[in-house]
Design a protein with these regions (language model features):
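A transmembrane-helix-recognition feature enriched in membrane-embedded lipid enzymes
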Residues: 1-43, 90-95
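Conserved H-X4-D acyltransferase segment
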Residues: 27-80, 92, 135
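Soluble, non-transmembrane catalytic domains of enzymes that act on hydrophobic metabolites at membranes
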Residues: 37-45, 65, 77, 83, ...
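Residue-level preference for the first positions of well-ordered beta-strands
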Residues: 52-54, 97, 124-128, 156
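Membrane-embedded segments
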Residues: 62-123, 137
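Generic beta-sheet signal
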Residues: 79, 100, 128, 160-163
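A cross-family acyltransferase "interaction/gating" segment
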Residues: 87-89, 137-190
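Soluble extracytoplasmic domains of inner/organellar membrane proteins
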Residues: 108, 115-116, 123-147, 151
């Protein structure tokens, strides 16, 4: 609870006053703190992580966002409905989330221009091209339009494979947030 409150205060009071570089460091530090509190350890190979990459990841859980931000702070593309979620929508809107109205090609073009602009400025942008969460054991069809901004900006696409593992080396499905699993159930399972 204290960590969530600190995230709200950070977003409300401190981030608006910071330089872009400081904002990204704070986002990363807060994500690391959250993952530490949840007992999540991140392993990442950043050998191909150039400035301004489009991170293309599978989507298992709500914590995927913090896993990515802990390693490579990024702007995210999310479905427009997220903006209307209590507290979380407000946080997302103030933490570099670009909201996409699904099913609107016109809006997709606008979002793609915004993403290409960020990539052109050297910012990382993350997308979950499956458009939903899964248990992480397989991939769904990718919505290819989400890859267009990297092509438009001449920036690389960095594939990100997110999976969760127990300390004993067994794959963990605890973080999954798919099907009939509620946010509360997912959080308790982690």
């Amino acid at each position: 609870t204290l960590l969530v409150l600190s995230g709200l205060l950070l977003t409300l009071c401190l981030l608006p006053l910071c330089s872009e570089a400081a904002r990204l460091r704070l986002k990363s530090s807060w994500a690391v703190a959250l993952l530490d509190a949840l007992g999540v350890e991140v392993e990442a190979d950043l050998a191909h992580a150039l400035p301004g990459v489009l991170l293309v990841a599978n989507h298992v859980s709500w914590i995927d966002i913090y896993v990515i931000n802990a390693v490579m702070p990024a702007a995210f593309v999310a479905k427009a409905e997220v903006r209307d979620w209590p507290v979380l929508g407000w946080l997302a809107a103030r933490n570099d989330t670009i909201f996409l109205r699904r099913g609107s090609r016109g809006h997709a073009h606008i979002v793609n221009r915004q993403v290409a602009e960020l990539l052109g400025k050297g910012r990382h942008v993350a997308v979950f091209p499956e458009g939903t969460t899964t248990d992480g054991r397989s991939l769904l069809y990718f919505h290819a339009a989400l890859l267009q901004p990297a092509l438009s900006a001449g920036k690389p696409v960095l594939p990100v494979a997110i999976s969760y593992w127990e300390a004993d080396g067994q794959r963990s499905l605890a973080p999954r947030y798919d099907g009939d699993i509620s946010l509360g159930q997912c959080t308790r399972a982690i």
